[in-house]
Design a protein with these regions (language model features):
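Charged, low-complexity intrinsically disordered segments
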Residues: 12-14, 77-78, 82-84
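A short, surface-exposed interaction/processing loop segment used at functional sites
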Residues: 191-223
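N-terminal Sec-pathway targeting helices
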Residues: 7-24
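Local sequence-structure signature of Cys/Sec-based thiol-disulfide redox active-site neighborhoods
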Residues: 80-97
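Hydrophobic membrane-insertion alpha-helices, especially the h-region
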Residues: 20-35
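Primarily the internal scaffold of c-type cytochrome electron-transfer domains
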Residues: 48-76, 83, 98-173, 180-185, ...
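Hydrophobic single-pass membrane-insertion segments
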Residues: 33-44
């Protein structure tokens, strides 16, 4: 018969052992911390309200503890949650079918997409590109429904070495001017590939910033700031779009800059529209119509993406405490970000970069004479793509909505075609 120590003796020995005392102390501290964490989690992480969200402090996940909800785990992508107040854009089509269908042809709606056989504008027959500065060869390959970038070098005998193949997960850019290509890691990170399709020249080339011997290769990280203007807001966990959070994205991303980037969240509007007891005025008031906003707020809807002081420096600075996806149409853009300009010695009228259209608008006589009534929407219909063949007549008609024919001081003449400077380097 096996003999053992009495229970009382065992307990006395445990309390007498310093190592046991230390173990018990750690357990007690852990229990207290867990209770404190559970009791204060809502207080520390609840998003603040109002136009100026305060800094949110959130304890980091403890070693061995529960992970932050929605955070990427090894081998997993972030678990998406529905963005509050937003709905899939196709729900807008139930009442606005004509506008919805027309908008699908506009560049903004096609700014981000999956590679698809029905959406090919590239030349995959003439798919080879050699980049002299880095001495690397590239081939863009289509394998059924899959797009692949192949990169390699040649040895002294002309044989391929250092071969890398990377499948393409996403296309960024509408293709009006160019298209770039991204791949997504299991952790949810997005990286840009070096090769771009340039539509105007119908050719492959290096992406902007890659035309040098020591470029980023396949390691250029796509940040939330990049995605802000290239896509609709993704479905991410609250707080995951703030400063210091990793730039990770769910697998199921929106495809294109949708209706709600300009009109605001549409869930409440749709819910009220489906209730026959709700007055029409209340339904209309539940969605933002930029054309009915005060002039500065109206312009801010466009300026959130179409105003950048310079691409050479960090000129768009989001206010600390604001998430990347926290701007809503109808809010002052200055509450969300700050535009930092620089003085290079030239008059502003002589400067023009990719997103300087608002500067030119504010310099125009029409804008000044109308006290700001002239806006982007005066000439541009964001729901419609104007084809090159109809552009001259279309924009002439827009001018004539304000100007009579006898107001013209110059003889009508054709427009001289110009090409934009090559900014790929």
């Amino acid at each position: 018969m096996k003999r053992g120590l009495p229970r009382a003796s065992t307990a006395r020995n445990l309390w007498a052992d310093p190592r046991s005392l230390g173990l018990v102390a750690l357990v007690v501290i852990a229990l207290i911390w867990i209770r404190f964490d559970a009791a204060t989690a809502d207080t520390l992480t609840r998003p603040p309200t109002g136009p100026f969200p305060a800094l949110v402090f959130k304890p980091e996940p403890r070693l061995g503890g529960q992970p932050t909800p929605g955070a990427a785990q090894p081998g997993q992508l972030p678990r998406p949650t529905t963005a509050e107040g937003y709905v899939p854009d196709r729900q807008c089509a139930a009442c606005h079918r004509q506008l919805y269908n027309s908008y699908q042809h506009v560049g903004m709606a096609r700014s981000f997409s999956r590679p698809r056989p029905d959406n090919i504008i590239e030349d995959f027959e003439n798919n080879h590109y050699f980049h002299g500065p880095s001495k690397r060869h590239y081939e863009m390959i289509r394998r059924d429904d899959t797009f692949v970038m192949k990169r390699y070098q040649l040895d002294d005998t002309g044989q391929p070495i250092n071969v890398l193949e990377q499948e393409i997960d996403w296309i960024i850019g509408s293709g009006l001017h160019s298209r770039g290509y991204l791949y997504q890691t299991q952790a949810g990170e997005l990286y840009q590939l070096p090769i771009v399709w340039y539509t105007q020249s119908q050719s492959w080339g290096m992406a902007p910033g890659y035309d040098n011997p020591r470029h980023d290769g396949v390691t250029r990280l796509i940040t939330r700031e990049c995605m802000f203007c290239h896509n609709a807001y993704p479905q991410v966990s609250p707080g995951s779009d703030r400063y210091g959070q990793p730039h990770v994205f769910p697998r199921d991303l929106p495809q294109g800059t949708g209706c709600q980037r300009c009109h605001g969240p549409g869930a409440a509007h749709i819910r009220l529209a489906n209730d026959l007891n709700v007055p029409v005025a209340e339904v209309v008031a539940a969605i933002v119509n930029p054309a009915r906003l005060a002039a500065p707020l109206r312009d801010d809807v466009c300026f959130q993406c179409h105003l950048q002081p310079t691409s050479k420096l960090t000129s768009l600075v989001r206010r600390f405490g604001r998430g990347d996806y926290s701007y809503r149409p109808g809010q002052p853009l200055s509450d969300y970000l700050v535009h930092l300009d620089f003085d290079d010695g030239r008059d502003r009228s002589d400067r023009f970069e990719i997103n300087h259209h608002p500067y030119r608008l504010h310099q125009s006589t029409c804008y000044k004479a109308s006290d700001g009534a002239l806006s982007c929407l005066t000439c541009h219909d964001p729901h419609r793509k104007v084809t090159p063949t109809e552009a001259a007549a279309y924009y002439r008609a827009r001018c004539l909505t304000c100007h009579a024919l006898d107001d013209c001081a110059r003889v009508e003449m054709g427009i001289v075609s110009t090409s934009r400077p090559d900014r790929r380097g």
